[in-house]
Amino acid sequence: MEKYYCSVSVSPIRAEVSEKSEMTSQILYGETCEIIETEGLYSKIKMDFDGYEGWVNSSVLKKEN
């Protein structure tokens, strides 16, 4: 799978595909993840650090070189 990293200082990880959904965690600048699926403006990610899964705005993710 392709690896992605967070390109902003901090971004919420949400339980559902919505800005109004509960924030269950955060992804910090430079932390890496895999994209499991994409829906609209959001991507469901799995964090490399701890395996945590949730939804983030796709615009904060950049593909690793």
Region spans (language model):
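Boundary regions of SH3-family modules and the immediately adjacent low-complexity/disordered segments
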Residues: 1-10, 17-18, 22-34, 39-65
